[in-house]
Amino acid sequence: MAGNQGNYRENPTRNEKKYKKANGQPRLKEKSSRAKSDNVCPYAKKCGGCDYQGVEYKEQLKTKQAYMKKLLKPFCFVEPIVGMKNPLYYRHKVHAAFDCTRRGQIVAGAYRKNTHDVVDIESCMIEEQESDEIIRDIKDMLRSFRIKTYDEDTGYGLLRHVLVRKGYATGQIMVVLVLASPILPSKNNFVKALRKKHPNITTVVLNVNDKRTSMVLGDRNITLYGKGFIEDKLCGCTFRISPGSFYQVNPVQTELLYEKAIHEAHLTGKERIIDAYCGTGTIGIIAAKNAGEVIGVELNRDAIRDAVTNAKRNDIRNIRFYNDDAGKFMVEMAQKGEKADVVIMDPPRTGSDEAFLSSVVKLSPERVVYVSCGPETLARDLKYLTKHGYAVKRATPYDCFPYTEHVETVVLLCR
């Protein structure tokens, strides 16, 4: 999701918490009068990750559009939401938690809503299908290789999670085995057996998470097969994806989202751009072709390493990356009297903070392009910016997560 940096706590597909209220704004809710959908998920009542299960896709879009219009009414006109032609199997990053029941049955899938009880899921209607097949086969292989699942309560066991990432344009597949120990019994034979079932796998990585924590990924990666990363293409550029780095999960909508963001920047080839919360550098690298200079700022170390590599991979020479907190970095820029023509900000769902927003005001860029994945925090941040000299020109919502309540939005603000 745009702006989510570093590690994460739970399955981002099925167990994300609902938006927190900001400035008294209503959160997005499912309408009681709704058209039924033919796409029925057998796990809906147990999993609870898809807020709009059983709702016709057109009705989902209508509800989200109405919500965004109401939320952003004080600021600007809201353009029609950009939906998907095919709203199924869109997630190209799939995470499964592993556990064992009291009867000894191995389960793999999503956390039951607001718990850490694992719901055993064979396939998910919003997840890339080959990724689900890989997870299913890993689950079936555990007993023959005598690999025990990790028990959060006791701290015993080995396999905690499996993360599968697949490049939409390249087809490259990365499998990340999250273990409580760096030692995987018969690791070579395990990888060989897995690749025999799925020869399309590009790389297999062992991630070590040996702490009593709800965080999914640990800090250490051991490559068991391949290069330890995959690549994908977006808007004509090639990007490296490592186990812990941020990369949008819906590539079809992401391309449209980023193209809109760069279009709203109105670049002529001379502008100095600040790409805040830049992740692996995707937006900044794509924009650099039409800009004078781009400065990318990101807190996640893995992501910033990938960003530097991505710039070199695409022969982009007018971009620099800094491993720093975006808010702190912008404050220091403002204190030094530095200027920027455009700020592109892509914060996490919690939105930005006042220190960052005040630094934007001090830098006084002519245009601010806000890429939001949290509507209510977006409204909160727009309220601050409009009080300090900016006018919101327009907002365009994108449905990057069909069957969930989440909405991404590109907003243009001008001095």
Locate each region found by the language model.
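Rossmann-like S-adenosyl-L-methionine
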Residues: A2-K31, S186-N188, K192-R415
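Short, aliphatic-rich beta-strand segments
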Residues: D99, V164, G171-A180, T238-S242, ...
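Accessory substrate-recognition/RNA-binding modules or partner subunits associated with SAM-dependent
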Residues: D120-E122, I126, S131, I135, ...
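Short, solvent-exposed loop/turn elements at beta->coil junctions and helix N-caps
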Residues: P80-P87, E152-D153, H161, R165, ...
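Nucleotide donor/acceptor-binding cores
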Residues: H92, G171-I173, K270-E271
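Short, acidic/hydrophobic/Gly-rich beta-strand patch recurrent on exposed beta strands
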Residues: G109-R112, V176-V178, A307
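N-terminal hydrophobic or amphipathic helices/low-complexity stretches enriched
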Residues: R27-C41
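Extended interfacial segments that mediate partner engagement and assembly in macromolecular machines
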Residues: A35-N39, G49-T149, A169, L184
